[in-house]
């Protein structure tokens, strides 16, 4: 976990994600042979935001700065939609065991897990 006096060191990771977003946008713009300043700015800002979120999540899991940098850069390059899909799968893997059918609840005869199981 990051210390209170070290938070500023983690600002570099959204910048790395922004570079990833710029590379991704540049690749697409070259393929389409068209460049838009607005799309470029939106891509850069969204990559920085996603990079910050990935950095905060990784710091909460005590990942090393090397892993944080790699994760932030890849998240910026892959884009927000990819990160949302991965995050959604992660959340589903944590929630699904609670929602899976279990033994019959004797109080109301409905299948499903209860908090008493």
From Swiss-Prot:
Membrane topology: Multi-pass membrane protein
Keyword Disulfide bond recorded: no
Composition bias, Basic and acidic residues: 107-117
Pfam families documented for this protein: Phage_holin_3_3 (PF16083)
Sorted UniProt keywords: Antimicrobial, Bacteriolytic enzyme, Cytolysis, Host cell inner membrane, Host cell lysis by virus, Host cell membrane, Host membrane, Membrane, Transmembrane, Transmembrane helix, Viral release from host cell
Region (Disordered): 97-117
InterPro entries associated with the record: LydA_holin
GO CC terms in record: host cell plasma membrane; membrane
Keyword Nucleotide-binding attributed: no
One example of a Gene Ontology biological process annotation: defense response to bacterium
A GO molecular-function annotation: catalytic activity
Cell compartments where the protein resides: Host cell inner membrane
Residue intervals passing through the bilayer: 6-26, 40-60, 67-87
Subunit structure: Homomultimer. Isoform Holin: Interacts with isoform Antiholin; this interaction blocks the holin homomultimerization and delays host cell lysis.
Function text: Isoform Holin: Accumulates harmlessly in the cytoplasmic membrane until it reaches a critical concentration that triggers the formation of micron-scale pores (holes) causing host cell membrane disruption and endolysin escape into the periplasmic space. Determines the precise timing of host cell lysis. Participates with the endolysin and spanin proteins in the sequential events which lead to the programmed host cell lysis releasing the mature viral particles from the host cell.
Name this protein carries in UniProt: Holin
Gene: XXXV
């Amino acid at each position: 976990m990051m210390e209170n006096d070290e938070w500023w060191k983690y600002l570099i990771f959204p910048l790395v994600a922004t570079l990833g977003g710029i590379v991704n946008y540049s690749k697409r713009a070259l393929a389409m042979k068209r460049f838009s300043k607005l799309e470029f700015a939106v891509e850069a800002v969204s990559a920085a935001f996603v990079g910050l979120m990935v950095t905060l999540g990784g710091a909460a899991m005590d990942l090393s700065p090397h892993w944080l940098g790699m994760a932030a850069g890849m998240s910026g390059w892959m884009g927000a939609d990819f990160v949302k899909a991965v995050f959604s799968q992660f959340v589903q893997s944590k929630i699904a065991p609670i929602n899976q059918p279990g033994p019959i609840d004797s109080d109301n005869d409905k299948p499903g897990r209860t908090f008493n199981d």
